[in-house]
Regions:
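Sec-dependent N-terminal signal peptides
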Residues: 4-13
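N-terminal edge beta-strand
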Residues: 21-47
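Short amphipathic, basic-aromatic surface patches that mediate peripheral association
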Residues: 52-57
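Sec/Tat signal peptide C-region and signal peptidase I cleavage site
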Residues: 15-19
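Extracellular/periplasmic metallocenter environments
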Residues: 101-146
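Extracytoplasmic/periplasmic copper-protein system
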Residues: 20-29, 73-92, 133-146
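Beta-strand signatures of extracellular beta-sandwich domains
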Residues: 66-70, 129
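Short, hydrophobic/aromatic beta-strand segments
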Residues: 59-66
Length: 146
């Protein structure tokens, strides 16, 4: 009985730890930089919640940022196509299946969050980036599941 109680106690402590591993925070600034070049979550995460905070002061029209996830093979084509999509579409091609997840564009002092499933992403070569025109070449990084 003592062992069962100990296991129950430990499993109760482990649940929040697993939840935290599936929650990511990224900051972007007015210098066109994310605060990280690599993000990862364990394969045990069925869903990821990502929060993007724009720590700068410039408005969305001048220095907007978002967070977009694609396969690395699709990254450049999606980023290029997004430039023509305009700000109303978050500089992303509308309904493009190559976009695996994305936040909306935000300006200085703003925060946005998204949640997305990880099914089928484990072991894939993935890239995250900002699709605001001119940003994607500098504001990018790798994303790994597992």
């Amino acid at each position: 009985m003592k062992k069962v109680m100990s296991l129950l106690f430990l499993s109760a402590l482990a649940a929040p730890a697993f939840a935290d591993e599936c929650t990511l925070t990224v900051e972007a600034n007015d210098a066109m930089q994310f605060d990280t070049k690599a993000l990862s979550v364990p394969a045990t995460c069925k869903e990821v919640t990502l929060t993007l905070t724009h720590t700068g002061k410039l408005p969305v029209a001048a220095m907007g940022h978002n967070w977009v996830l694609t396969s690395t093979a699709d990254f450049q084509d999606v980023a290029t196509a997004g430039m023509g999509a305009g700000p109303d579409n978050n500089y992303l091609p509308k309904d493009d299946a190559r976009v695996l997840a994305h936040t909306k564009l935000i300006g200085g002092g703003e925060t946005t969050s998204i949640s997305f499933p990880t099914e089928g992403l484990a072991g894939k070569d993935l890239t995250f980036f900002c699709s605001f025109p001119g940003h994607w070449a500098m504001m990018k990084g790798s994303f790994k599941v597992g």
